Amino acid sequence: MLDMSDVALSVVQRSFTMSVRAESWRDGDLLAADIPVADGSEDRDRSLAVPERISLTVPRRDRGYTWDPGADPDHPLAAYGQQLHISYGVDIGGGDFEWIDRGWFLITETSSDDTTVTVTAQGLLTWVDEAKFVAPFQPSGTLASTIRSLVEPALTVNFDGTLVDRSVPVGMQWDSDRLGGLTEVLDAWAADAYVTEDGVLLVEPVSDDGTPVLSLTDGHGGTVMHWQGSSSRDGAFNCVVAQGEDASGNQLQGVAYDRNSASPFMFGGPFNPLAVPYTYSSPLMTTVDQCRKGAAAKLLQLRRTTSRRLAVTMVPHPGLMAGDIISATGAGLTNAPCAIETLTLPYSPSEMNLTVRVL
């Protein structure tokens, strides 16, 4: 969860007055410090290659300034490298606002009509997604240095200190997909990566552990307005097989079984008495231990889209981010740990929507 003072945390437990501050930057230069945001929203979805997307509605003309970029590539709302820095304000009393930094977003499209301008922006991994290789790329060095080669200088990378770096096997090659290469390295390293609110790519071990940052309840004094659950067998599995090869070309594999007794897909449980595997492979895994760790991490990641999920409608909480662990009471649950998989934060007075996965 993003940093918030105790005062702001208490305010967002009930209806409150909010504001959004949007700045436009390009190549380190501030182009506009106070974009007049009339409406908008922020969407985050951990299952997407670029998880973040925002939409802003801005008056075409405000305070004598035209916010329609037209054909001007240097306009604050043009889509030629302009970035939006978004902060969400909470009125903590006396007209004073506490500003929560929601992050940096790359403008991808701007359109206008007679009265309004609509701006669409996405997370900074868009740079990596767009940048296909102009020639086949052969990684060398280590997993960490390969990630730096894939994303820098577009993004600065920080690595969690608990990750153990290792050499990349020779002979690998990616033909065009830079972001796909990044995903393959992360999978082989049993790691996750996301862009922080500071615009830095943080690489850390895959994990669903953590102390709940917030308790959601529909009871007295709660902030939840509505719960809605869903379940499906589509794409379900009860084990993951990760395949690699050693330096001699011998095929290796590691298997991770879903042995969580609380999981509806538990291996050996009523979901299916037989193994239902999800299989993936990468030459970056060169030992059985690496394959086993990769399989265990992939099992956690895939559960983000196949486990029991709940849709939550609630009073907006600008500190919440995708991946945060919350505690849920309602919809048949009591203090159940859940991970936020998707969220929609309105940039005007409205309700916030979450999709949470029961852990």
Model-predicted regions and their roles:
Residues 43, 127-149, 158-184, 208, ...:
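Short acidic/polar beta-strand-loop edge motifs in secreted extracellular
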Residues 54-57, 116-122, 200-202, 311-313, ...:
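A generic structural motif
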Residues 1-31, 197, 205-350:
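Acidic, small/polar-enriched beta strand-loop surface segments
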Residues 1-134, 187-190, 194-195, 204, ...:
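Assembly/oligomerization scaffold segments
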Residues 155-163, 188-200:
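Short, well-structured beta-strand/strand-turn elements
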Residues 147-158, 244, 248:
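A structural motif
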Residues 70-77, 163, 315-319:
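Short, surface-exposed secondary-structure edge patches
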